[in-house]
Amino acid sequence: MTNTPTAVDDGPQNQDTSQLAPGVTIECRDEQWLVNNVSKTADGFRIRCRGVSDYVRDQTATFFTALDKIQVFDPADVTVKPDDSPHFRHSRLWLESTLRRTPVPLYQENLEVATQMLADPLDYQLSAVRTALSDDRIRPRVLLADAVGLGKTLEIGMILSELIRRGRGERILVVTPKHVMEQFQQELWTRFAVPLVRLDSQGIQKVRQKLPASKNPFSYFPRVIVSMDTLKSPKYRAQLQKSRWDAVVIDEIHNATNAGSQNNELARTLAPTTESLILASATPHNGREDSFKEILRLLDPLSVRKDGSIDMQAAKKLIIRRHRNSPEVASVVGQKWAQRKEPRNIPVEASPEENAVARELADTWVQNNLSSERLFPWTLVKAFLSSPAALQETIDNRRKNLEQQDNHHTELDNLNHVADLNAKVTEEHSNKFIALVNYLQEIGVKKGSERRAVIFSERVATLHWLKENLDKHLNLGKGAVKVMHGGLPDTEQLALIDEFKREDTPLRILITGDVASEGVNLHSQCHHLVHYDIPWSLIRIQQRNGRIDRYGQEHSPEITALLLDPQDADSIGELHVLTRLIEREYSANQLLGDAAPLMGKHNPKAEEDEIRRILTRERDFEEVVASPEDIVTGAHAKVQPSEPAAQDDDTDDIFALLLAAEEASAEASTRDELETDGTGVTGTADSIRRSLYAAENKYLEDALNEAFNDQAFAKTQAGGVEYVEHDNDIVELTPPKDLQRRFDYLPQDYVSYRKVAERLMLATSVPKGEQHLRAAREGDSQKSWPRAHFLGPLHPVTEWAADRALASMPQSEIPAVLGDVTEPTVLLMGTLTNSRGQVVSRVFLSAQELTFLRGEDGTKTAQSSSIADVHAWLREVGLQDRAINPGDFDTPEDITALIAAAVTAAEDTLEMTKTAAQEKANQRIDAWKQRRKDWEDHGNTQRSLLVRDTERLIQQESELLVSMTPQRSLVRPLVVILPRKRA
């Protein structure tokens, strides 16, 4: 039986694409290709595939049905060949690889690969993944608004890995702030084997130089990570608008919500170009409803009505939000996230020299306000409370400005007087600095000690002043004290963060500005944080504290604030106000997981202005900074109308929505705990491995032995890869040229630093993978890339080995094996795909001949039965790693007729599945149409620019929804199992 391509009419426009789906083989340009991904275009399909015929083997290519003549091989037209390999290795490889190459349905409830990664998947994190992939939503578009430290990056990694397994993650774009780009890239690669190529402006330019002028640089790499600062440039907008992504991640999305800003334009440009959109921010609400509505519109244009009001029920489904003390989080984090201690506020009695400066500021500047700028006296106060260096810098800058103007002699004289007083506040006469030294020595920061601390200050001048004097007074040695601030180059910032994470470096004290307060992890080796000066903002305090108070922190975080207490404290009023600010942030962290609602400004600058009004006695602290308990009461009243709200309640609607989302997330976690995952296992973290292989390295080993004729261990010159399996969960191999080519799509810093093109080391167990990851961060390298990379289910090396192993197998052939069956049995896979070529449903069937029934033309008939768990079924029939293969058996002469009958029976069964899937899709369409009607009916009739833009997005989503309905079914025979008695 020979398999010939489906006949088509001449010309690409007349092609039969009814069987085009992932996993089929096609012929294009006189070569054969295995289809990996199919996506709809305006005039046909885009087909991403990998070469299987000799000339193009292992090469990747993209074809368009509008341009190329595509011939599809009928997957049901196969020949059967008895498998004579040891333990039916060839068949197990073929089946495992085919199952992995075929995407699982997008809406499959079971998590396929997320629990098999190098992560510690807690139930609340897996619940977030399930929620993102739920069939309640048309496509995965969510806002991950978990509080600082809950592991949003891990959740993103799990969502992306599941999307990849579902055939929805071929092209991925991740956009982050530049200072967390390397950290994000490392997490996704080391833990999930999701490779992102890091691009900056120079990187994009290098790609452009490799391509024709008309080629889009963002099409060169399938998965990339770029900083928001780089990508927001208008010069990239045209290329971004033309690019299409399967998934886009935008981290710290609150930086892109101000309408008209370049960041916002970037987010608006990217949102329509992707099917899956993951937005992340611990502080998504900046106090302006319009900004939060921008986030909602990016995710779902129907979530904000025409009149500008929010559809609360729709919006709630878009948001996933929890915090450290949410019940579903607190119950599982345990020692993986030690409870934060109450803050320690250290009041420091000012020295005579400090008191002299404070008195001058209070009497001359604050009370008399002789400056031409009303707020400048408080700028001086804030600088004074930071350090003598910060105050001197402020004075110098002011003098430069005034010297260029007339009529400021009095102010200049007073500035000079303050400068003279300030010059006497050396480190020996700065009691706050002395208190810092005493505190650091008290907690054990000294020469030869492993203890570390991170010190925050708002002023760069203070950072350098502290470094200079701590070096002098602590004598910790070279490289023990370092400074980081936003003025440093990106590479230097990333290197400092990386150095502070690792155990083997001499760095003991990191003195940093607020550039490190957002998104940077500093908890690996540190649980002591010092506020040398205190921001006049709850948000900034919370962001700083979150650097060490986060998941993975095994020691109770200790937050300490140094509070200078001058004799004239009442005049500049700082001590009691900032003490209460620190305490309120702690209370909010415990109850809400977020301090921003206490002031309702959601913006550090706006909060600072309000705190200044408290200091100037214009407002009372309780008026400006609400208690967390009052906030919860007000929010509940907004969400639950049955609960009476206080008349003066000013809790904003957005926080009420976030609280409702938090409660919905808790309900989802509870449901996940009660429901099974489809395999009979309750809970979420203990997921069964769905594979014919007990471990990933066994799959790799079989693939290598099959590919290299059982000589994988041989030297490369002898046709092997020098494969070695150590007894400590480590394997090694020397990558051949075809594998090295795939390394072009890995993080290049990892490839070059670990020299993986020369020798590749893989960790085959989670404990060993964690050990190497920890060693890279703590002791044995200059960079945080692990020496042995974890071998997870999406690892490109395993994919390469399987491709290489099956390369010589004819595309029209399936194996036959011996098993525990009574009659010849055909295992088949049926898939339903939509018009975009995506798998909507996947079923497995076994079929046997109906010996008592023949077709009208005398042909065989068969009966098919559904298989709930194909891996368990294959093990039950005996296809296991120790299966006995006598190696000498034949297939029945009428096996071709049996396969034809099995395919017919399977098609009948699949038709019922198709009907049910179409009904589900129609329900989804009807529900969406009703939402669209409500949107159109709700609000004014004026068609503003925003409304017109929203209408365009709604129409785009309408077309997408229709294209996602099941349209085509495909049945593929996979293997024939013959009774052992035939041997």
Where are each of the predicted segments found?
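Charged, non-catalytic accessory extensions
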Residues: 1-11, 16, 31, 36, ...
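SF2 helicase/translocase NTPase motor core
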Residues: 58-72, 77-98, 103-134, 152-155, ...
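Walker A/P-loop
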Residues: 139-159
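Hydrophobic positions on the alpha1 helix immediately C-terminal to the Walker A/P-loop
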Residues: 155, 159, 291, 435
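Inter-lobe coupling linker of SF2 helicases/translocases
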Residues: 213-214, 220, 224-245, 256, ...
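A short beta-strand element within the Helicase C-terminal
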Residues: 244, 291-294, 520-533, 558-561
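Conserved RecA-like helicase motor core of SF1/SF2 enzymes
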Residues: 514-554, 566
